[in-house]
Every structure is written in structure tokens, then in C-alpha cells.
Amino acid sequence: MDQGIAQEFLSGKSERWRVVLLLVVTILVYANTLLNSFTYDDFLYILNNPAVTAPTLKGFLEPTRAFNLFRPVTFLSFALNWAVGFIHPFSYHLVNLLLHAAVTLLLYLLCCKVLERMPEGDFVALAAALLFAVHPIHTEAVASIVGRSEMLAAGFLLAAWLLHLRDRQILELVCLVLALLSKESAVCFLPLALAGDYARGEFKPRQRYFWIAGVSALYVGVLWKVQGGRFGEVSVNFLDNPLASLPATWRILNALRVAWKYVGLLIYPGALSYDYSYNAIRLYEDWRHTFPAAVAAIAVLALWLWALWSRRRGWVLAGAIYFAGFAVTANALVPTGTIMGERLAYFPSAGFCLLLALMWVRLKKLKAAWAWAALIVLAGALGARSVVRNRDWRTNFTLFSAGVRAVPGSSRAHCNMGGQYLDSGQLDAALTEFQTALAIYPDYPDALEYSGLIESRRGHDQQALELLERAFFFTRKESTRYGERAVNLAAMFMKVGQSDEAMGLLNQAIEVAPGNARAWANRAVIYYWRGNVESARVDAETALLADPSNPQAQKLLEALRTPTRVAPR
């Protein structure tokens, strides 16, 4: 490219073309997500979430039993999508694509503003935003519909930051509240605003920061209240975050190792995964494996503090975004609900992209042609990887298949893959995956349950009973699967003639999940066996109220109306 043309194209006179470039690139890279279906957590957070499918004010303002989250703006956006597109995923993916484009533009505008006095600051801003637009680590946030919380929080946070720089305090605080109500990670805004003002050498009046701190503190108080006097999960699931089971020292040291894994994926996003649960990442209580990560982290922090002291505004901004962005989810202060997730790197990665842009500008000063070629090649390679990765999110089968390849040590990845085989009737392949999952984590309730159901289908009743008993034993009462597992185990006890054990389990299931039609229907059958016809009739009718198509309850009521008919077992 001729340097004069490039200079004109990227000059202040042509800023609209930079915006067009960023929009076009973003759309080209993520257009194939519009073909994707609902996948993985989309079913829990959207399709099976009454706050989305039957929204009420109460539903938005309190966490559900299934997931102790307070993100009303995010769930409101899903509800609006539901009102427009119902179970058709296109509109959901379209909104995600547009949100990513908006966040990219906001990042560009923020960098332009903070770096406006820096030589070639506009080039840095463009390069950073371009790399952010195409980086494959963002595919989980964009291609997974529930990743929208990351983009909403990042977008409103960047908007609040821009408004802060432009002294629009009321709108700044409004955007901050919207960011916080999108995802709790937006609580990092105060240190970001301070770092940005320090880098520019223009602090705002003190009361401006007090307002930010006050709004953030108020949000934290509300979060604590609506989550029942606690933050996040009642207790962190070992499978989701094994870091939580380690002593504090080893948890922090291993969290630093995980932090370097994020860096590795930012540098080389080759093996990307939707899952990093138990055994996807090796953890150590050994200084030989943890000390190097700690030393490297201290060195990086010291380098950033030096940049802070010397007021190198680009480096200060990059470090602030990266460190503050990961502060809530790093598992260093307190354990969170997950050990690692690529979606969690969505906002922090902007700091990494800015760092690359700063290094690129240095190269540009030495060899402009080489620098432009390098940027084009790098953006092209990252964009191509994103396009390929987007296809992994097409269906659950493609996603889980890719997960098993990327993290073969993950018990959950194998269990999820087994679930896909089970749904398609491939029992042998399913059982192989479940057995692999149990070889990695023998106490995995999901793998135990599904293995038991397969053995039951094959007539291996005793083996099935043992597996289902273990699955139920390792299931917490607050789990959404508790009632269903109680029913499955009860059905197995009924099959082998142990009705007393089955009755006790069904009573528990009805207590925990009174809308479980199978629990009522199975209990009705036991009452029928015992000659308690009236109780059998009441339970069967209750089952049909919960699920009018329940075949067991239908057959039982037919048997009660026609005494010569045999009741279901």
C-alpha cells in the first residue's frame, strides 16, 4: 500500500472510513454465527428460563434456583429476543454480532480519546480495535448466545468511560448501572477511570470518583441482598472450579498458572474450548510447578508499575484494562464459579490488543511497509481462526466434539459428548464417553446417572441400581437435577420390587420439585400397587396437571376407570 494513500485513509479527515472498516471486518468474521443453533448453556439461561420465556418484574430482579445470578439487563435482552424470535436463534445471534461490533467501535473511540496526545495515537487505536474485532478468544462470547453478558457489560463500561472523559456525569452513571446489571465484573470501573485519567494527566473533581464508588458500593449491597446474603454460588462446585478446594496459598498460585494460560490463548488461540472444568487444567500443590508462574506474574506487574510511574499512557491503559478486567474472575481474591472461561477474557483482551498495537506502532516507525503487512497478515490469520471456530458453535454435537479434542482430560467434555450420543441412540459410543468421564472423575453425578440409565435399558438392573444410587448420593439438594435423579433412582427401585425405597425417594422429589410429573405418576403407581386407589387417582391427576402428555399417568387413570386393564409399572 502506498504510504500517502494509507496516511490519507487513516487521517482524521477519514475517520468515518475507519468506522466502516471495523464494522465490515467484524461482520465478515462473525457472519457465519447467524447460522448457528442454540448450544450448551443457551438452553439453561434462555429456553428453560421462565424469566426469559414468561418474563415478570420479579423474575428479573431475583436470582433463580438454577443459577444464582443477578443480571437483569442481560436477561431482559434475552426476553426481548424471545418476544421477537421465540425459539428461532437467528435474532439472538444477530444481536450478539451487532453488540460485538458496537464494543469494537467503543474501544476504538476510547483509545482515540485517551491517546489523543500520543504521537500516532489514532493508528494505535485503529490497530487495537481491529485486532479486538477478529481475535478468536472472543468466539465464545459472540457465538454463544449467553456470552452476551460479557458484551453488554463491556459495551456499557466503555460507554461510561467515554462519558467520564467527556464530563457527562449523569449519563456516565447511567451506563455504569447498566453495565453492573449486565454482569458483576463491571464493578472494576473505578480503577479503570482513575488509571485513564492518570495516563492523560487530567484528573476529574474528587466528587466524581466518589459518585462512581458510591454507585458501585450500592450495587454490591443490592447484589448481596438479592442473592440471599451471599455472593455467587451457595458453594462452588468442585467440578466447575477445583481451585476452590485448594488451600488459599495454592489456590492463588494455581490461579496465576491459569492466568498464564489466558496469555497463551491470546498469543496462540489454537486449541479453544467451551469447557475448562476439572482436569482440563492440571493443578499442583508443588512449588516447582507454581513458583515460575508467580515470578513471571510479579515481573509483569512490576513492569506495568514502572509504566505507571513513568506515565506511559498507552502501556498504563493496556495494563489497567487487562488487570482490572480479570480482577473479579481471576480466583485470586475469592474463588468464583468457574476456573477459566474464554468468555471471561472478552473485556480484558482489549488490553492485550492495545499492547500489540503499541508494539506495532514501534515497528511502523522503523519499517512502515513491513508493519502494515504484519498487521494485515495477523488480522487475517486471527479472523480466519475465528471463522473456523464459529462453526464449532453450530450445534451441541459440533461444540462437544471440538471440546473433547481440545481438552481430552476434561471429565465434563466427555460426559457432554456422551449425552449427545445418548440422545441419538448410539448407546455404545455414549457409554464409552461416560466411562472415560468416570475414569477421570469417579464421583461425577451426570456420568453416573447416564451410565445407569444405559445399563437399565440393557437389563443390567443391579449395575444400573448401583450407578444411580451413587449419582443421587453425589447430587446436592439445591441442584436442579436433584428431583429428576431421585425419580430415576425410584423408578429403578420400583423395577426391582423395592417400593418402600422408591416411595421415600419420590416423596423427596415432590418436596423439592413439585412440578415433576414423573414423580407424581410413579408415586401413583405405587399407591395403586398397594390398593390405595384414591391416592393413586389424585397423584395421577396431579401428574397430568404438570404434564398433560405423561403416558404413565394416562394409563393409570384408564386402568382405574376400567378395572380389567392392567396398570403401568
Annotated model-derived regions:
Residues 406, 440, 474-478, 512, ...:
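Structural marker of alpha-solenoid helical repeat scaffolds
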Residues 403, 436-437, 470-471, 475, ...:
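Canonical positions in the second alpha-helix
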Residues 423, 457, 495, 529, ...:
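Register position in tetratricopeptide repeats
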Residues 2-461, 469, 483-484, 488:
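Polytopic membrane enzymes that build or remodel cell-surface glycoconjugates and lipids
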Residues 453, 473-500, 504-506, 518:
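Alpha-helical adaptor scaffolds
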